[in-house]
Amino acid sequence: MKHLIFITALFVLSCNEKTQHTAQGNLQEDSQESDKIKVLNFATFHMGNTSDSKSVEFDEQNRKNQEDAKKIAQMISAFGPTVICVEVPASESEELNTEYTKYLKSPNKASTYYGEVGLVAFEVGRINNVEKLYGIDYRLEYNYNINNDLKNEIDSATFNNFQSNPFASIPELNIFEEGLSLAEKLSRMNHPKFLDFLITANADILTYVGSKNGYEGADEAAEYYKRNLRIYSNLNRLPLTKKDRVFILSGGSHTAFLNEFMQRSLKYEVVNTFDYLK
């Protein structure tokens, strides 16, 4: 009987220790989570000239559009960013900040520099007293239309079905629907399903394209992955601290890739965009 009591007591003690270790582990996990740099990773369409194969119509010179963009900037500003990154090549950061300085001196005059950069990012920076912006883009050409350059021997049916009706799986998120406000377009773009769709549309769909023994489509898709990895690498070059709050404004497909990378990151914690886009 004494042996039984001893064994039972030992078991209870062991369970208590395990519970304590588990609790400590959870606390450490929460602590590590809170130590990560908060990032608001925001998807947009290009509000100025773009080389994108399909673009949303938007007149950046239109006064109402400029006012609507400013309202978006005010929503985003509630995040309180200390660092702002935009889809401008890192090599053009000096020009970027020259234009930003001009805007700070005359904020009542809308800037259309790189479209959404001038209309949204500059205003977010002004409201939050951010001294300078960072360009993190890396230009890398790839062939969206590789299917037109060869006889597709892989799976032309799947590829063509997607191209003929790309929004078939997410009709409720079609950003080309007429009558949508700017806020609604951006709300749809930042929906997780739409971001997944953008990775499919810009890269993964090309894996269905290729010659009999070739990987032409996959190779083009790899170029787009490469571009986004380099954008991520440019982000990682920035001298950030754990106290920084980072706002990234870029075309939707880049937002989608960066989300994928940062969700696995030991350094960043992506916040919910819809806490600010309301």
Per-segment meaning from a language model:
Residues 1-33:
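Bacterial Sec-dependent N-terminal signal peptides
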Residues 45-65:
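Acidic/histidine-rich helix-loop elements
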Residues 48-50, 92-96, 142-145, 255-258:
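Short catalytic/ligand-binding loop motif for oxyanion handling, primarily in non-cytosolic enzymes
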Residues 59-61, 69-75, 91-98:
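Post-signal peptide N-terminal segment of secreted/secretory-pathway proteins
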Residues 63-73, 110, 233:
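N-terminal post-signal-peptidase region of extra-cytosolic proteins
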Residues 76, 80-86:
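Proline-aspartate-enriched helix->loop->beta-strand connector
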Residues 95-238:
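Hydrophobic, often amphipathic alpha-helical segments used for membrane interaction and targeting
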Residues 221-278:
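A cross-kingdom marker for long, charged
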